[in-house]
Amino acid sequence: MELHDLGEILLVNDSYNANPESMTAALRTLALLSQERGGNSWAFIGKMHELGVDSELFHKQIGKLAGELGIDHLVSIGVPEYIEGIEGTNTSGHLFADIQSATQILNRLSGADVVLVKASRAEGLEEIAERIISIWSVPGAGGVER
């Protein structure tokens, strides 16, 4: 897990490995960091690989946990089960088919927000983390993509 303090935005990049236990720990960390900073919490999460026949259930449970923890925005890349899990909660769900589509929502990030990027390595979500770093590490960028 890598922390990148980009001034206004805090990025938690854990895009290299994901299983139910590490996803749970990462979401709990996101919730705590967001409470400390006072901004919105954003979870950009992708598929957890090698879960076997219960894969859909595990993904839905992670979505449910995000809702229970009060994560503000759950951005799912290609996994509708995460969005199913947040039904009935105050968490806003955003489902995108691929990474490129998901980057469209980055312009909604704002000061004091905490962003988690997490998935199994094969999903390539480090691209989202790199995009966030490139946008927010420019002094005075304020989240405006250049």
Predicted feature descriptions by range:
Residues 2-146:
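ATP-dependent carboxylate-amine ligase
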